[in-house]
Every structure is written in C-alpha cells, then in structure tokens.
Amino acid sequence: MRIAQIAPPIESVPPRLYGGTERIVSYLCEELVAQGHDVTLFASGDSETSARLVPVCRQALRLDRSVKDIIPYYILMMDKAHRMAAEFDILHFHIDQFHFPVFRELANKTVTTLHGRQDLPDLQKLYAGFPEMPLVSISLAQRAPLTGPRFVGNVPHGLPRDLLAPTLNARGGYLAFLGRIAPEKRVDRAIEIARAVGLPLKIAAKVDRVDEEYFRDKIEPLLAQPGIEYIGEIDDCAKGRFLGDARALLFPIDWPEPFGLVLIEAMACGTPVLAFNRGAVREVVDQGVTGFVVESVGEAICKIGSVLALDRCQVRRRFEERFTATRMTHDYLDIYAALLEREAPAKPPRASTRVIADSVPEIAAGRAAGVGLRENVVPPVAAAGEPQARSS
C-alpha cells in the first residue's frame, strides 16, 4: 500500500525531546515500512525515518526562534501533499483539521487521527461543515463530546515492543512525574502527594513559552521543598531509566486527557501508575493491574501503598497485550483497507467485445437508417419498468 503520513512540523519525527504526536507518527511509519508498505512522511527536515521524507521546513518549528507564525508552514505542507496526492492510496493526517478544505474532494482516501482535546464548542461547528472527512479517535472519551463527525475507528496509541525495557526491581526509590509543566498537568498535586507519603519526587518536564509565567510564579517556589527534584526535559535515552527506576508514575491531571502516552511508557517499563480520573485515563489504566485511578489528592495518598505493591511483571505483560505499535499499525491498516474498499469504483462488467449501441455514433446512425445490429452490439438498457428488447 502507498501511504502518506502528514505530521505536524512543530517537532521533528521522532521528536528530540517532548512530543507525543510526532512519536506516534514515527512508530507508525517504522512499523508500516517494516511490514513492506511504501511510506512517505511529510515532516520537518530534521526528521529521521525509514520512510521517504518530504521536508516541509528545514527544522522543527519549535526549535527555530526566527519562526513567529506556524500557519504559513502548514499551508505550504498542505499544498505539497495535495500536489502529490495521486501518488498515494491513503493520506493519513495528524495535523488537526488544517487540511479539511484542501482535501475535501479526496475525503475517502484520507484519514485524520485526532490527537488533541475535542471538547471545545467551536469544533462541533467545524466538523458539521466537513461531514465527509473520515476521523479516528485515540480514545472513546476523546470523541464523547462530539455528535455527527464521521468516525471510522478508535485506535489507542502503541509503542514498539522493545523500545523500553522493563525494570522489575525499581532501584530509585522515588515517584516520577513526566511530561509538561502546565496548569492542566497539575505537577503541584504530584508534589503534594509525594510530600504527604514521604517519598522523593523527580520531575522530568518541559516548560512551553506560554507556560513560563505559570512555572515561575506557581511551580518554581514549590521545587525548593525537601525531596523534590526538577530535572527538566529529557530525551528518549534517559526516559527508560527515569521511568524504570521509579516506584510509580504520578499522573494527577486536571483536564480531559485524550490518551496519556506517558501512561503506557511507564507500563512498558513495568512501572505502575497512579492517575486521576480525567479523560481517557480509565480506558488506559487497568484498575488494580497496571495502576489505580483516583478522584482526589486524598484518595491518591490513601492508594499509594496499593500502587507500590502491584506486580511489575504483570504491568509489563498488560502493556504487551494492549499497547504495542504492531497492534496499533494493524488497527490502522484495517481502517485504510475499509476506506479503499469504499473508494474503489464498482467492478466493470466481464470483459467483452460488445458495445452499447447508442454510445457509438456510427452504429446509432445505422440503426436510424434501419441497418441491423451486429451480434457484438448490445442495445441500450431499458429504463426501469420498460420492456427489454428481445432478440429474434
């Protein structure tokens, strides 16, 4: 199958540091190539992939301080993908809804994975304007606020099976927080929980420009407390050890989380999770197996002992059963195949030398003059309810 993957140019594929969407695009591309598909990736020029790379900018836009507006780069990327669209059987978009107006006439050879929150009221109006666009959610909770869009599947994220090795005996003795420092991620809750249960907390997280004031005013003063260590943003090489050595991952979010990639990254390391019941969390965490889902800081403090007692071998086993990139890729291939079957034209009649009489001017003229039809000419099909012509 000839497949185009269109990724956000904000980060490289895979990202150097933080970037959940770009990671998933990378895992999907690599698995598709490994399975023998012809894959083209539209992404930033500093991306690394086994697929054919079509660069849409020199480097990831987040790393280029000269970039003040990302929209021109998205427009250029959509134009390039549209001009090349005939080369592909399927175009798989991971860029929200930017491409909808451009690819509307090609809707059935596109699919769009929604990676972000979908509870914003204006999105309902947008999807109502593009009812033909096939969409994929990454959790059922993500799509729950929407009515009307054309969902063709739900595909939870997956990781390469051997990306993160399990650590069956956590050596670090600390709790971990991994992700972004932002109001909705509630690292302040993680600090409160760790302090209450008397365990060290290590925080590996990035701070976006938009959240710098929040970090400076609200979070930085909390980092001076005993047992709290802020590491900053880490890369994939450091992630395995950071999560594997942790006794548990804290995920105290306060927003409608579409999936929560860090949850399955921790599970791949054998590390259990303590997560707040928001968004897709209950779909990802198997209660009492890979972690515990709680409603409040107080409940989290009470449950920490149960989380630490979970079997890390079983946590890893459940990851392998539910959240591998191979499973994710098979799910997407099933969706591609279903879309292509719908897009394929109706099968033509069995090959024959016969023609429809009135479609050839010379034959039609002969009929008008009373000239008999040859045997390899079929009279036009009668309209419904009219008698069919009989051969004598």
Predicted ranges, named:
Residues 1-373, 380-382, 389-392:
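Catalytic cores of nucleotide-sugar-dependent glycosyltransferases that transfer UDP/GDP/TDP-activated
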